[in-house]
């Protein structure tokens, strides 16, 4: 058992770690996003597309040089936490994450993006009722905490949709739903976008899964071979739309398509789509029981 003074020191230390990490990912793209954008840039053949990709990389470099957010919309901060039941600060983690967001808002700085519903007042701290949003997965007997930070920008959040299909619509209905949403809405989401598809029973379970899907490293595949094949076929088909970087036409519309799924009710197919923009700001931090940590998503950047 920690003494109260030692626990407070540990709380302060972890708060600082998470705050620094959150501020850092506002200025730097994760390794896989940079690599994918470079791949798309090298493959682009349209003159306008080449100019847009050049501007994107110039923007990313200036963000690093000036230590300023890569996009002025630093989003609403969300955390997806996979934590062991024996992690020493499990009981304090919710408040740690909230305090870390408030500190990162000043350090980065982050744009103020938390508006209280009905009052329509911006809190000015990026925290508020239910914000930061935290999704929990508890691992029995584990003592590490894997903290995924996601900055949900307005533009890339707007195309999000969820629907419950009749089972007779089948996977063809899922594909139709994805294409209808991306073809009509992704143009305003700062493409090329990363597409997350959730398939489950209801709108809420599918929606959470679709968000988790865009947290996976780009190009990772669903463990079910049939789902993995559908990911690839959707990616190929969506790229044929020719939306291109920033919606100005080009070879690629998406950085990738990821599917997350859960067993469904026999009478329903819940499907949801979430998108991440080209400036896909998310990061994965692995914190051990002794509060040493590993930056899993930004191996080329030091905290």
Swiss-Prot record:
Superkingdom per UniProt = Bacteria
Q: Which UniProt keywords apply?
A: 4Fe-4S, Iron, Iron-sulfur, Lyase, Metal-binding
The species is: Escherichia coli O157:H7
EC numbers, comma separated: 4.2.1.32
From the Swiss-Prot or TrEMBL record, give the protein name. L(+)-tartrate dehydratase subunit alpha
Binding-site list for iron-sulfur cluster: 71, 190, 277
Q: What reactions does this protein catalyze?
A: (2R,3R)-tartrate = oxaloacetate + H2O
Query: What single Pfam family name could you report for this chain, choosing any that match?
Result: Fumerase
- State the disulfide connectivity: none
The coiled-coil segments of this chain are: none
Q: Which InterPro entries match?
A: Class-I_Fumarase/Tartrate_DH, Fe-S_hydro-lyase_TtdA-typ_cat
What up-regulates or down-regulates this gene? Induced by tartrate, via TtdR.
